[in-house]
């Protein structure tokens, strides 16, 4: 009954003011368009919320990004890794690299956004939650429709998932190299270990490749990986890793 009411089209009866004169008749098509747009928008939002709620409990089997990548590279075997089976230093490293205030914000890091706007920089300020929304539900690339959907999905994810669930899903769908998706595949392919066995150095190097997984080598130290290792230690001390 609920689903039937959800998808039932809006009533299109003639407005009560149809007999009020030619002015009311002239606005009738616009009013009908607005009614249909509102009906579609509310149903789309409800479906998005249902999908987010499902993935709060069910692990996403694949993503559009993985499907697209499979056309150019073989996809390494992916085994889902629960958050408790990922080394704490790996969790801290990816947060230090991608979103140091992950435990403190509600999906959008407004302080970082203000810094970007004030500096006039073209760099992004996407949080891990925003990246999870993009990686799980949407597609890669820059476009206003995708950004709009990401902006809707992000607070839904924050409302319906725990911080640990967000990080777990992110680490299981993130790309760490050509055809290598998820922390389980990355730990196995690059270091021959399980995610629980990753060292601080390995975790920092894996986190360092995330902005450009097709061109960066997690077997090579870099200034970025050293900075991430320091950042992971810092957020462990100052409490910004408490939710992990």
Where do the model's predicted regions map?
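Juxtamembrane regions of bacterial inner-membrane/periplasmic proteins
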Residues: 2-244
């Amino acid at each position: 009954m609920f689903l039937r009411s959800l998808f039932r089209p809006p009533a299109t009866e003639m407005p009560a003011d149809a007999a009020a004169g030619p002015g009311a008749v002239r606005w009738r098509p616009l009013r009908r368009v607005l009614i249909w747009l509102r009906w579609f928008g509310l149903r789309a939002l409800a479906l998005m919320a249902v999908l987010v709620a499902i993935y709060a409990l069910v692990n996403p089997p694949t993503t559009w990004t993985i499907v697209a990548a499979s056309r150019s590279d073989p996809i390494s075997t992916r085994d889902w890794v629960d958050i408790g089976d990922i080394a704490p230093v790996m969790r801290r490293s990816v947060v230090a690299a991608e979103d140091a205030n992950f435990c403190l914000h509600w999906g959008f890091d407004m302080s970082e956004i203000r810094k970007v706007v004030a500096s006039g920089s073209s760099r992004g300020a996407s949080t891990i939650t925003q990246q999870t929304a993009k990686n799980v539900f949407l597609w890669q690339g820059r476009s206003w429709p995708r950004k709009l959907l990401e902006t809707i999905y992000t607070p839904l994810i924050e409302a319906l998932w725990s911080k640990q669930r967000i990080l777990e899903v992110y680490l299981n769908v993130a790309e760490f190299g050509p055809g290598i998706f998820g922390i389980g595949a990355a730990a196995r392919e690059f270091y021959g270990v399980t995610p629980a066995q990753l060292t601080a150095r390995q975790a920092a190097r894996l986190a360092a490749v995330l902005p450009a997984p097709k061109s960066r080598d997690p077997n090579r130290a870099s200034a970025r990986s050293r900075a991430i290792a320091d950042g992971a230690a810092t957020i462990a001390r100052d409490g910004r890793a408490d939710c992990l």
